[in-house]
Design a protein with these regions (language model features):
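Basic- and hydrophobic-enriched, low-structure N-terminal and domain-boundary segments
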Residues: 1-55, 62-74, 78-79, 84-109, ...
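Helical "lid/switch" subdomain of P-loop NTPase nucleotide-binding domains
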Residues: 83, 300, 304, 328-332, ...
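Long amphipathic alpha-helical segments used for membrane anchoring, targeting, substrate engagement
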Residues: 459-509
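P-loop NTPase motor domains
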Residues: 69-72, 76-78, 85-310, 380-381, ...
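Generic beta-strand/beta-sheet core signal
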Residues: 44, 53-55, 81, 121-123, ...
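Conserved ATP-driven motor cores of ASCE-family P-loop NTPases powering translocation/secretion/packaging/pilus
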Residues: 2, 66-68, 91-109, 310-396
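Conserved P-loop NTPase motor module
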Residues: 1-16, 28, 130-136, 344, ...
């Protein structure tokens, strides 16, 4: 048997499926495309997650786009994290061009231009349906992980949530959270100490600094109402029955990784808490693509990485698949990389000694093969080509295959501002979520309580007992005057906020 026939038999047997699948492309050997060697991705294994990696300009985004189209055609909803802004073209039909026609001819497939049902979402100032979550929904554990708090600080946050629950104080946004922090440190300190124990002002100040740091990355836009219902991500187009493609526009978050990580972890936790258990179903209920995944992992604390790892392990039983897109597999922590069933590896570039080391490590992550020199091939792959292995329907890794990938059917480019406006005008989610709600919550309730208590406190306050001590300072003299004290408190609070903001900015990781 010739090497080519042996290769063809290996690929056809390794990628055979009984159930439904997506066609990723056609296998290649020695630059030849085998039109009868389909590279198939079984739908039932999509909840085992995946990785799409490769250097800039090698075709990662187009691969992501093609897989998204295939899922939508199968009626499976998709959520895309669009960091670069080049995925919105899914909403418009693609264009023919000579290179595209030549690729389709080599692969033995027909190109059909098509658009897909798209909803644009945002957690920042980008245009789209706004996603929000309340601080209460976020919860003390997740909030503590994001803020990178120690055990003592986590305990204070948990106590703060308990106090708000016990006293009917809604925690909707960060303004509420900061107000409660100030309350338990100042006016409410005695009440807190009696019910929950003494809280150190140094601890609450540290927590406040970290909240301010998060705010400076734009988190105030994310926390609040109306809360996003993750079940809205499961929609299909009522006319075509295609799965809705929800594109999260994150173009302005590239330099704000903490907010990106906050949003991602919150979303995954909410999906896990909301979706019912389905086990290993014939097809996923939702597939999530996280582009530029290194933004989550680069500066993440160990506690945050552990939280992400746990959610990735558990969420597959909810029928949810998660695919990370990044430049090299080494961007993804080993504990998470080991859980990713599908691996699509585009070309890597070897410019430095570190690059060569990364390529060697990447080659070791793939199944051994008699048909390729994996390490060499990783640097020789053309644009729109990739090394692929997926999980078979039996759960085993398929043979490694150099693959010419199918091209997207939708536009390989961005929408114009006018097209974005038209899309948002038709959006069901924009009408539902872009109303800003600011109902009475902890901030207003505690502000009112302070205002009610202040006059009584000044009128009924006992004179301090006389005792021998040093001559009063100018500060203590001023604070004997109620008006001066109130003015001074306000001034000091504003000065402190400004100072803490600077400290938050300079805090190292």
């Amino acid at each position: 048997m010739s090497n080519q026939q042996n290769f063809l038999d290996t690929i056809q047997q390794g990628y055979a499926t009984k159930g439904d699948y997506l066609l990723l492309g056609k296998a290649m050997l020695n630059h030849e495309v085998f039109t009868s060697a389909d590279i198939r991705l079984p739908l039932r294994t999509l909840n085992r997650h995946g990785l799409i990696a490769g250097a800039t300009g090698t075709g990662k985004t187009k691969t992501l786009q093609h897989i998204t189209e295939g899922l939508s055609d199968k009626g499976i909803p998709v959520l895309l994290m669009d960091i670069k802004g080049d995925l919105s073209g899914l909403a418009q039909c693609g264009d023919h061009n000579p290179k595209l026609d030549e690729r389709c001819q080599r692969m033995g497939i027909n190109f059909v231009s098509e658009s897909y049902p798209v909803e644009l979402l945002t957690i920042s100032n980008e245009k789209g349906a706004r996603l929000r979550a309340t601080v209460t929904e976020f919860g003390p554990i997740l909030l503590s992980k994001i803020l990178e708090l120690n055990d003592t600080q986590q305990g204070v946050v948990a106590m703060l949530f308990k106090y708000c629950d016990d006293n009917g104080l809604p925690l909707l946004d960060l303004k509420d959270f900061k107000k409660v922090l100030q309350w338990i440190t100042n006016e409410g300190a005695e009440e807190i100490e009696q019910q929950y124990g003494k809280v150190s002002s140094a601890t609450t100040s540290t927590i406040l600094r970290k909240i301010i740091e998060l705010e400076q990355q734009g988190a105030e836009l994310f926390f609040g109402e109306r809360s996003f219902d993750v079940r809205d991500l499961l929609a299909t187009d009522p006319t075509t029955q295609q799965g809705m493609v929800h594109i999260m526009r994150l173009i302005d978050l590239q330099d704000r990784p903490k907010l990106f990580a906050t949003f991602m972890l919150s979303l995954l936790a909410e999906i896990y808490a909301t979706f019912p258990e389905v086990g290993d179903a014939e097809r996923p209920k939702l597939v999530i693509f996280i582009d530029e995944a290194h933004l989550i992992f680069n500066d993440a604390s160990k506690a945050l990485l552990n939280q992400i790892e746990t959610i990735i392990k558990l969420i597959r039983s909810k029928g949810v698949g998660i695919f990370f897109c990044t430049q090299t597999p080494t961007d993804v922590p080993d504990a998470i990389l080991g859980q990713l069933g599908m691996k699509v590896q585009h070309a890597l570039r070897a410019f430095t000694a570190k690059d060569r080391k990364d390529i060697k490590l990447t080659a070791q992550n793939y199944p051994e093969t008699a048909f390729y020199d994996t390490e060499t091939l990783l640097t020789e792959l053309g644009i729109g080509e990739a090394l692929i292995t997926v999980l078979s329907e039996k759960g085993n890794p398929t043979p490694l295959a150099q693959t010419m990938l199918c091209p997207p059917k939708s536009r390989m480019g961005i929408l114009t501002p006018e097209e974005i406006t038209d899309l948002l005008d038709q959006s069901r989610l924009v009408r539902k979520y872009n109303e800003v709600i600011d109902r009475e919550s902890a901030f207003e309730m505690l502000t009112q309580k302070v205002q009610q208590q202040t006059p009584q406190t000044e009128e009924t306050k006992e004179k301090p007992k006389t005792k021998e001590k040093e001559e009063p300072s100018w500060m203590s003299t001023i604070t004997k005057n109620p008006m001066a004290r109130q003015l001074g408190n306000t001034l000091m609070r504003e000065v402190t906020r400004g100072l803490l903001g600077v400290l938050g900015l300079k805090k190292g990781r």
